[in-house]
């Protein structure tokens, strides 16, 4: 299911969100089957969303293959790229302005930051962590760069990503429908990349943002 809340007062609104990076696989059919059934039984909607933010693996023909595979299985959708709907567009590559507005809010509130570390540095960091049997993850080297310096470097064209700024202390708590209350120390949560160097969002941002909306 998606992150959309369902209850007796709100019909379920669920989705399947495959990535057009190759041939359709059984996982897509599995999710579509269960979510479509859930939507139909609850009088809700079943959506098809195309998660096409991984441009390095994107295959133009894969989207049509996804459509045909789901139609062949009889798993028709109510809203999607080919049908439209009240929350269009349903391709993530066509929603970049929406993600950018969210990032601007996160940056302004201090919940995200630009990271100028090169791919080589990140690779070396991970190798060092493996060699020293340390927890893998970003070391926060760019967390304390001033806003002025960060903006200047970005204006100068220096390559960067935008990361989530996870608090150094405390814990994150949420309720899982199956497992109940889950508590995770913030020290164990990585500063995940939200926007890549090409300006496209990662799964961590786009998937959550679209499920909520």
Predicted regions and their residues:
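A short, compositionally biased domain-edge/stem linker segment
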Residues: 1-6, 147-151
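Active-site cores that bind ATP or allylic diphosphates and position pyrophosphate for catalysis
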Residues: 113-213
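N-terminal Rossmann-like or analogous alpha/beta NTP/dinucleotide-binding catalytic cores
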Residues: 2-131
């Amino acid at each position: 299911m998606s992150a959309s809340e369902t209850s007796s007062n709100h019909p379920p609104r669920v989705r399947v969100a495959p990535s057009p990076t190759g041939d359709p696989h059984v996982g897509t059919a599995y999710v579509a089957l269960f979510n479509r059934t859930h939507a139909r039984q609850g009088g809700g909607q079943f959506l098809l969303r195309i998660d096409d933010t991984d441009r390095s693996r994107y295959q133009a023909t894969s989207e049509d293959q996804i459509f045909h595979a789901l139609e062949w299985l009889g798993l028709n959708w109510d809203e999607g790229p080919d049908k439209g709907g009240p929350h269009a567009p349903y391709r993530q590559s066509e929603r970049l302005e929406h993600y950018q507005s969210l990032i601007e809010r996160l940056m302004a509130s201090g919940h995200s930051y630009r990271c100028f570390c090169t791919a080589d540095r990140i690779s070396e960091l991970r190798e060092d962590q493996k060699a020293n049997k340390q927890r893998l993850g970003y070391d926060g080297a760019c967390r304390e760069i001033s806003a002025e310096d960060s903006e200047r470097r970005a204006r100068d064209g220096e390559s960067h990503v935008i990361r989530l700024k996870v608090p150094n202390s405390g814990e994150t708590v949420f309720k899982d429908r199956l497992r109940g209350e889950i508590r995770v120390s913030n020290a164990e949560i990585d500063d995940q990349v939200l926007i890549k160097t090409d300006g496209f969002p990662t799964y961590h941002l786009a998937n959550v943002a679209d499920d909520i909306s």
